[in-house]
């Protein structure tokens, strides 16, 4: 982007891409088609992080990693008037594995690698365990292209301020960021997940601070329920947004980068020049922060002084802020329901059709709000002709439940069927277990319903779709190997109160939403009777516990002690119900311990 007086604007294309998991050749072909379609109108095309394979490969990284030379061979010959291309991929380099991005130029009828950046900051929190499967890069450098000096970072590299500063100090006027950012935390009225809002803050801040362009190409699609959201962005050197990609869909987002705006922005806000001037002093300060420097510093606090600081609450446990945590957590449970609906519809469509290769699903319809919401979402995602709703009543099932199940089946126009489970249950009880307890009998009914759903799914070449919510899962309030058995569950990360809100948003009949929640396994018994606390009370407590608050902090923050204790005990006592069966590890290839592959591999 040098010689801005004579150079026309740089035309960039940010590709939101859904790779086929671990199918490198198929993904290269899709990349080639996209390049060919944009070759006459684009100067630079950017594909997301791990475009060759998908992001979550676990131990499969080694099987999908290629060298840069192998990638160039797979890419074949570039089209006429080819743009430059950036591709994110798992790289094999010097017998090691990296999460990398390569900048390719078309020269003399073939692709040439101008630069490779290897991701430095590898996330190892939450669902991420990247450092287990690849090694971190150790270098960040700006490089020359026919469009001027460019720098590349990958995803979390961008969340740290120093790499972008180093590239800008190295002369980069354009920062290219392939990314695979998971959607999470859907706050109301945001229109985007909270992590995408954070992306916009980071990129705008880096662009404005350094007077550079920043472009981010985001992966899109569901990988085993982990949703890449899209939302690619291009930001100008004044921090303004030049382009935004759509959410949850493949797309090519175009932006025009006028190099002249760099000079104008740096004149208006000469922050990069200030940084260059202060850099030697900052380097000396940085050197003084080395771990051993504190020990050499005569002004370092003595041990008893450090203890006094801890006592003042600057480090360690301090008083809980004077806030009502119940109000805070209840507010945190509010959702952007339009965005959640769109996300879950795309999740069902992506996981059932693209990842698993099915067209249809079966849903057990109880007449309760959870199954009503799952059924409605499935019909929106797949069409009602591809959704089979099964009523599976026992003779003591309430007439109200049957009527409500019929109501939602009629509303959604799903394919409806009723199968009575009374005879097989009663026969087993009469012949073998005449003294069976109500709890065991309820579990027996739940497991038989699951068996029937799986058998019907085999008959219909369909997948069972789950209906269990997050509150039930965290409280252990479900029948093991029954409610939790469907392979796909759109509601599993929604608290019960959030399901109620989503149900209202979807237009589920009020009579279903407002009735007391019940598993309808024991006549007249509600969820609250069995759990011992209402969902409205339990959900904010659960949110606090899984967010890292202790029982004591929640009680001091305003929650009722007996309810916090009850919810905490149920959470702690039921971890086993949320895990796969425990296997004795006897080898270095134990499945799920050493041999790791994602569910959609």
Walk through the language-model features, giving the residues of each:
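ATP/NTP-dependent adenylation/nucleotidyl-transfer catalytic domains that generate, transfer
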Residues: 279-363, 373-601
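C-terminal beta-strand edge segments of enzyme domains
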Residues: 212-319
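Cys-nucleophile CN-hydrolase/nitrilase-fold catalytic domain and related Cys-dependent amidase chemistry
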Residues: 24, 32-116, 181-205, 209-212
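Short beta-strand scaffold segments in enzyme catalytic cores
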Residues: 87-89, 99-104, 141, 232-234, ...
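N-terminal active-site segment of His-dependent metallophosphoesterases
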Residues: 1-44, 176, 343
């Amino acid at each position: 982007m040098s010689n801005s007086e004579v150079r026309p604007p740089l035309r960039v294309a940010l590709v939101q891409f859904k790779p086929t998991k671990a199918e490198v050749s198929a993904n290269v072909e899709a990349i080639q088609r996209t390049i060919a379609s944009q070759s006459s109108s684009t100067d630079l095309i950017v594909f997301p992080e791990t475009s060759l394979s998908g992001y979550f490969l676990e131990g499969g990284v080694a099987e999908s990693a290629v060298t840069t030379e192998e990638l160039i061979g797979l890419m074949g010959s570039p089209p006429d008037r080819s743009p430059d291309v950036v591709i994110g991929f798992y790289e094999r380099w010097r017998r090691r594995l990296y999460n990398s991005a390569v900048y390719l130029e078309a020269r003399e009828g073939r692709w040439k690698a101008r630069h490779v950046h290897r991701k430095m900051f590898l996330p190892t929190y939450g669902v991420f365990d990247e450092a287990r499967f690849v090694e971190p890069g150790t270098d960040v450098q700006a490089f020359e292209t026919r469009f001027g000096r460019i720098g590349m970072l990958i995803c979390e590299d961008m969340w740290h301020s120093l790499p972008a500063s180093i590239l800008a100090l190295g002369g980069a006027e354009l920062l290219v960021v392939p990314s695979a950012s998971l959607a999470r935390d859907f706050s109301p009225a945001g229109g985007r997940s909270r992590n995408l809002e954070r992306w916009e803050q980071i990129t705008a801040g880096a662009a404005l601070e350094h007077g550079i362009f920043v472009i981010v190409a985001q992966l899109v699609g569901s990988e085993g329920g982990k949703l890449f959201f899209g939302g690619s962005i291009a930001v100008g050197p004044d921090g303004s947004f030049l382009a935004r990609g759509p959410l949850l869909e493949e797309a090519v987002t175009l932006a025009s980068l006028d190099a002249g705006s760099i000079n104008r922005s740096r004149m208006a806000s000469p922050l990069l020049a200030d940084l260059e001037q202060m850099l030697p002093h900052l380097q000396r300060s940085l050197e003084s922060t080395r771990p051993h420097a504190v020990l050499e510093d005569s002004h370092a606090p003595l041990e008893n002084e450090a203890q006094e600081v801890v006592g003042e609450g600057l480090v360690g446990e301090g008083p809980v802020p004077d806030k009502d945590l119940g109000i805070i957590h209840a507010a945190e449970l509010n959702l952007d329901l339009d965005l959640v609906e769109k996300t879950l519809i795309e999740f069902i469509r992506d996981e059932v059709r693209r990842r698993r290769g099915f067209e249809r699903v079966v849903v057990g319809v109880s007449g309760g709000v959870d199954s009503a919401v799952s059924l409605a979402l499935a019909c929106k995602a797949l069409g009602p002709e591809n959704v089979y709703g099964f009523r599976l009543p026992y003779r003591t099932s309430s007439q109200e439940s049957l009527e409500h199940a019929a109501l939602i089946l009629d509303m959604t126009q799903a394919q409806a069927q009723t199968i009575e489970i009374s005879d097989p249950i009663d026969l087993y009880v009469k012949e073998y277990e005449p003294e069976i307890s109500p709890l065991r009998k309820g579990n027996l009914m739940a497991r038989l319903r699951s068996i029937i759903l799986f058998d019907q799914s085999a008959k219909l070449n369909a997948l069972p779709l789950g209906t269990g919510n997050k509150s039930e899962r965290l409280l252990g309030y479900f029948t093991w190997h029954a409610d939790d058995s469907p392979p796909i569950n759109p509601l599993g990360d929604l608290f019960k109160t959030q399901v109620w809100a989503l149900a209202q948003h979807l237009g589920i009949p009020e009579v279903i939403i407002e009735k007391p929640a019940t598993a309808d396994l024991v006549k007249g018994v509600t969820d609250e009777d069995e759990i011992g606390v209402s969902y409205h009370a339990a959900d904010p407590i659960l949110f606090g516990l899984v967010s890292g608050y202790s029982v004591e902090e929640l009680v001091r923050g305003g929650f009722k002690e007996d309810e916090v204790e009850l919810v905490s005990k149920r959470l702690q006592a039921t971890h086993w119900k949320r895990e796969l069966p425990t296997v004795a590890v006897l080898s270095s290839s134990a499945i799920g311990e050493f041999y790791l592959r994602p569910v959609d591999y």
